[in-house]
Swiss-Prot record:
Lineage, broadest ranks: Eukaryota, Fungi, Dikarya, Ascomycota, Taphrinomycotina
Name the record gives this protein: Replication termination factor 1
Gene that produces this protein: rtf1
Source organism per UniProt: Schizosaccharomyces pombe (strain 972 / ATCC 24843) (Fission yeast)
Subcellular location: Nucleus
Domain remark from Swiss-Prot or TrEMBL: DNA-binding domain 1 interacts with the repeated motifs encoded by the RTS1 element as well as the elements enhancer region. DNA-binding domain 2 has only a weak DNA binding activity.
An annotated Gene Ontology molecular function: mating type region replication fork barrier binding
Amino acid sequence: MQGKNNLSCRPDTEDNEELFVDDQLLSPIGDSKNTSSFIYLGNPISFHEYNYDETMVSPENVKTAIAGSAKDHETCRGFKKTGTTSYKDFVFSRDYTNWTPTFWVLLSQLIDEFLKESELNFVAARDLLIKTKRLPKPFNNLLIQFQIQVPNVSRRTVYRHLKGYFNIPGYERFQYVKKASSGSWGANDIITLEKEIAMFKKKKNWSDEQFLQYVWSDNHRDEMKTLYNCLYELIDRDKKSIYNYLRRKYNPFKKKCKWTIEDEAELKKLVEKHGTSWSLIGKLSNRLPMHCRDHWRDYIQPGEINRSPWTIQEKEKLIKTVNQYLQSNPSSPIQWSLISKNMRNRHRHHCRWKYYTLISRDIHNSSPFKLGDSIWLIERMMDLNVAEERMIDWKCLSEYANHLWTADACKSHFERIKKTLFIDGLSTFSDTLIHLHKMLNSSPEETYISNLHDSYTAFSNADDLC
């Protein structure tokens, strides 16, 4: 028997052997004689077969990999009997796989099964996840079941998306989105797109490699135009969004995100020769044109970035510069590259982060909303009689409140109300407001405290509010 700090095998029966790490049994998943998947301290791990070289290796790589910090497929060797005389060597691996719509389908199925078996409803399960940062015990088996089917996704990644599915505050970027007409693509839209592309390739008898080439080729415009029009009919996105997504996801360029010193030198030469013709530069450097553009703009063009603490003068200049831009371009998003030029050696990402940090401080420093204020805000939004949330005039609401709260503070508080009361799935924005108003008014009357009025009765008449 091997000592501690070793990955070892121990005889179990004549036909099988048990695998241990630091005297912790690796429990086999499925058929113990043929499986290459095990559970170690509650974590599913997988092994791939290689030639056996009779080398015993410390299991530290296994522990590191399970902790989520494995790099470049760190290797450990274990032993499992596959016959009476031959042994195999196994390599633990974890890919850094992007979260896909297929993973959402699997996770949502497992969540549905979990809720049925545990007899918890959605709200009760959400409350369990909110109470603690660690994974509650009832959810442990759910994560194990997911990783059995998708072993190359880390436990941490699954847990984050689990919290996102239940709309836990702070995990908004991991939330499940079925459909979205703008911004990040919804899971259902991506599944629809991938199915349609698979059918299209089969109909045209194109290989995967051919399809990648044709997406970026000028010689198959008619065929690709047919595909784009079909996707436009099926997916609630504009044609430009579909076109850009397809070219990002399906491209023949071999080089990805890593840049060497030689790659940067080559990019400088190409820009000197061809200017900002990023499509041409992308083809010549075998990279996505947008990757070339972004790397040039973010790392080469700015020169030496100023990373010192922001001075008071710089903060004031940043606020002034952004406000001037918004006044000149009220309907367009902020072009942070232009803001960065005015701030000299400040990176555009740093300018963006600092601006929103300063704005959020103004929001937090305003008077806190009380229950009566929340009801007042919902009623004012109902009075605006708009069909969608994006049509709300937050500046108008701020004026109604005599600027007690800024427009951004009103908007942020409304988002907080929706998350707190868990509003999802209502058909119209009007239904959402009515439902929120009803829920807020269900509280005891003595809690109806307001910054704007002495008591709730002071604004019970809607005609007297403005």
